[in-house]
Amino acid sequence: MRKSIARRLLFVYLLILTSVCLHAQYTPDVLGDDYLRRTFQMPDDYEGKVVCTLVKKPQLPDVKQAILYIHGYNDYFFQKQLGDSINAHGYNFYAMDLRKYGRSILPNQNPFFCKSLKEYFADIDTAIATIRAEGNDKILLMAHSTGGLI
């Protein structure tokens, strides 16, 4: 019985995740230089509406490996030199602004507030699903500070 409920919940979660990924689109990012961003509506939490934002450098031709950068506490992705360098070394580059950080802070939220680091799992799962859907077979995680704890 438990396995059946767990499987159904997993199926519903994956269905929602797929739906979220399909409905979001990339737009130019504030970093310029061809950086793009894509904001995902996530399920509401105890403060209401929640989003996370994936930033990327346009994909390199014929490259199927990517690095996903996850920032630390009280931070967000702004180090375009990092993305440029990773791109120059033959990897597609992505960075996640987790919920309530940087591009993902909404007016109803206390910036950086979470009750558990597990809240970020859905944001990272969304990023990984999107990166895979864009043709990357190999994904390496790179993190700073709190991003490494998650």
Language model features with spans:
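Short, surface-exposed "cap/lid" segments of acyl-processing enzymes
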Residues: 57-101, 107
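Glycine-rich phosphate-binding loop signature in dinucleotide/nucleotide-binding domains
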Residues: 61-62, 131-137
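Residues at the starts of beta-strands that form the adenosine-phosphate
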Residues: 92, 137-138
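Gly/Ala-rich beta-loop-alpha elbow adjacent to hydrolase catalytic centers
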Residues: 142-147
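Bacterial Sec-dependent N-terminal signal peptides
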Residues: 1-26
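N-terminal cap/lid segment of alpha/beta-hydrolase-fold proteins
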Residues: 25-60
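Alpha/beta-hydrolase active-site loop
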Residues: 113-134
